[in-house]
């Protein structure tokens, strides 16, 4: 087994601190704003869209934005429960995305190789646990339901919050607009991103090294059973009443 570099160890420590404090709005959102990490809730925000990384965040953001006939302001991509909590407490509509924990965790470590699988698992828990008490005040969507179910998802948001967001016109043109918005978001980001971990480069898929993915999956399955059960329980709690 290779010995992690000093940079890897520092990156892991930074990730631990970041995820351990990510549910404190005043602290986490101030840090996100300073580092240009995502878009933080403000009084003019129309909706918050958040989720653990690799859970359809970019697609949900772009699908909603592309469908609108008028400009809207979306808080998104901080990957911090603080953004969700701040949105709920401000009375702003909130959409939380969730992906099955094993797939989400493996997706993250494939693009953030300094992280260990167990660290990424703790990050999943630290994202969803603090917002579980707010479950009945938000709309939740599985990541796999975002693309094909965007119209139904926006209708759920409108029904839950009394909003009037436009639903998408599912045409080749609207898909092109959505894809352009995703590309623009990834291209126009500013700031250093996460401490030491930096910015994630957009990848069209997670089809990377099959050996790396297989090792990551094996590490997930050999992680403490109590942690795996907790992540599965969180996923169940957020999705059990979804259509």
Model-derived features with residue positions:
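The Walker A (P-loop) glycine that initiates the GxxxxGKT/S ATP-binding motif of P-loop NTPases
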Residues: 50-51
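Structural element of the ATP-grasp superfamily
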Residues: 64, 131, 208-209
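PAPS-dependent sulfotransferase catalytic domain
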Residues: 71, 80-202
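Walker A (P-loop) phosphate-binding loop of P-loop NTPases
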Residues: 54
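Short amphipathic alpha-helical surface micro-motifs
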Residues: 28-33, 77-79, 121-124
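Acidic, His- and aromatic-enriched active-site or binding-groove loops in soluble protein domains
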Residues: 73-75
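PAPS-dependent sulfotransferases, especially Golgi type II membrane carbohydrate sulfotransferases
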Residues: 1-46, 165-243
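A conserved segment at the C-terminal end of the G1
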Residues: 57-70
């Amino acid at each position: 087994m290779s010995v992690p570099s000093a940079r890897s160890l520092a990156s892991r420590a930074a990730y631990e601190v970041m995820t351990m404090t990510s549910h404190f709005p005043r602290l986490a959102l101030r840090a996100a704003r300073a580092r240009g990490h995502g878009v933080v809730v403000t009084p003019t925000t129309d909706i918050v869209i958040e989720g653990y990384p690799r859970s359809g965040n970019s697609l949900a953001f772009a699908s909603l934005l592309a469908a609108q006939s008028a400009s809207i302001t979306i808080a998104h991509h901080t990957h911090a429960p603080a953004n969700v909590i701040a949105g709920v407490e401000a009375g702003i509509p909130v959409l939380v995305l969730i992906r099955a924990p094993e797939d989400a965790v493996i997706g993250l470590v494939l693009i953030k190789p300094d992280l260990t699988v167990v660290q990424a698992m703790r990050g999943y828990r630290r994202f969803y646990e603090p917002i579980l008490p707010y479950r009945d005040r938000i709309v939740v969507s599985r990541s796999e339901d975002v693309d094909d179910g965007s119209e139904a998802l926006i209708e759920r948001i409108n029904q839950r919050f009394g909003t009037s967001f436009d639903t998408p016109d599912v045409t080749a043109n609207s898909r092109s607009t959505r894809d352009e918005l995703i590309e623009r978001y990834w291209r126009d980001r500013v700031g250093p991103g996460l401490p030491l971990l930096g910015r994630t480069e957009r990848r069209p898929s997670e089809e990377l090294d099959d050996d790396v993915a297989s090792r990551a999956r094996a590490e997930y399955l050999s992680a403490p059973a109590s942690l795996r059960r907790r992540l599965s329980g969180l996923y169940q709690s957020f999705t059990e009443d979804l259509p």
